[in-house]
């Protein structure tokens, strides 16, 4: 796509507004290539990749190259990254497996949009090291430990949202490897076992049911068959969506976040409910600023921004990705669709101790 030809989504976002939001992301990028949450804020590798994906969609390919090369330069020897960076310093030395895996989704998306295999080959060793690191933390029941603390000690449990994203990243990594003629090792096997646990043993994951991401992320990541995915979205809609205002980050509070709202729209598109996706994405207009940035969240009924006056790069990025999914403007618009083989993981049988 050329940023000169961005399509309008009437009542949601215009082509000019998409370009303005992309320029806002570019304005946040540091000379190193890092994309922080906001000016002077920290950066985490997952949201950094999300922002790079949005830049690719909007045609800012060189800026996306800089973002991915920043990530490559800071990858640790085992394939991981720290959780938060503030400029060139480490703000939080925890290592989150989901955060580490997402580069695979980012580079596969890059290939889908641009067709550029040269840059993808440059980045493939980064992707391979990251996915091999994440795969090494899979447990006997198929789940993947969610993090290691700053001393390198792994947590004993797994998270549903993070594991769903890891599943998606593993599948993207396999498609990337296939496109490049590179080996993907055991990534499919790891994804099969993880997908089985996600689809059939949700109790194996730490209970976080109040969070909207635990509701829609198994759908967004392609873990569930279409019928089950639609049922999941329908069952949780009233609990997690606040009237016409968007998605509650946490179901117990009327705090609507634009990033979760945009991701929910992506999940709705994934199951073929484009009209519902348009309706829910339209709620993000309340969050939009004139400069193309988006308020992170709005608390109701007072309609105050929370965190106060905070805009965030990942929110702007999620809006652009949802726009692309709905307008099909780039060849990467279906990165979060249900293209993955839904028959892979229902019957692992004796290899899954949770089935015994």
Language-model-derived ranges and their functions:
Residues 2-42, 65-100, 124, 129-157, ...:
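Extended glycan-interaction surfaces of carbohydrate-active proteins
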Residues 28, 37, 41-49, 53-60:
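N-terminal beta1-alpha1-beta2 module of alpha/beta enzyme domains
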Residues 63, 119-122, 126, 185-186, ...:
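Alpha-helical positions within canonical tetratricopeptide repeat
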Residues 1-11, 49-61, 102-119, 164-182, ...:
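Well-ordered alpha-helical scaffold segments within catalytic/enzyme domains
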Residues 155-201:
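Loop-centered beta-sheet repeat module
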């Amino acid at each position: 796509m050329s940023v000169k030809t961005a399509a309008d989504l009437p009542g949601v976002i215009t082509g000019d507004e998409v370009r303005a939001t992309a320029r806002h992301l570019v304005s946040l990028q540091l000379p190193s290539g890092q994309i922080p949450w906001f000016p002077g804020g920290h950066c985490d590798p997952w949201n950094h990749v999300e922002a790079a994906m949005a830049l690719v969609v909007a045609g800012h390919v060189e800026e996306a190259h800089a973002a991915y090369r920043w990530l490559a330069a800071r990858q640790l020897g085992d394939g991981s990254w720290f959780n938060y960076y503030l400029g060139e310093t480490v703000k939080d030395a925890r290592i989150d497996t989901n955060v580490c895996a997402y580069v695979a989704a980012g580079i596969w998306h890059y290939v889908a949009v641009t067709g550029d295999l040269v840059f993808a080959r440059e980045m493939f060793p980064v992707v391979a090291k990251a996915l091999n690191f994440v795969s090494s933390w899979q447990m006997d029941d198929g789940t993947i430990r969610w993090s290691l603390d700053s001393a390198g000690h792994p947590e004993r449990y797994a998270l549903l949202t993070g594991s769903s994203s890891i599943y998606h990243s593993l599948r993207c990594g396999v498609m990337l490897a296939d496109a490049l003629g590179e080996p993907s090792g055991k990534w499919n096997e790891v994804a099969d076992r993880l997908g089985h646990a996600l689809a059939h043993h949700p109790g194996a994951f730490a209970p976080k049911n109040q969070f909207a991401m635990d509701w829609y992320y198994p759908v967004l990541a392609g873990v569930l068959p279409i019928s089950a995915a639609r049922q999941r979205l329908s069952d949780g809609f009233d609990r997690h969506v606040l009237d016409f205002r968007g998605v509650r980050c946490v179901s117990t509070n009327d705090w609507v976040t634009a990033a979760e709202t945009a991701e929910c729209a992506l999940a709705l598109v994934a199951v073929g409910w484009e009209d519902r996706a348009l309706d829910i994405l339209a709620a993000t207009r309340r969050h939009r600023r004139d400069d193309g940035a988006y308020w992170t969240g709005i608390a109701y009924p007072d309609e105050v921004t929370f965190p106060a006056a905070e805009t965030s790069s990942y929110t702007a990025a999620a809006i652009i990705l949802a726009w692309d999914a709905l307008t099909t403007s780039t060849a990467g618009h279906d990165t979060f669709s249900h293209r993955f083989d839904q028959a892979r993981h229902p019957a692992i049988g004796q290899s899954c101790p949770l089935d015994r």
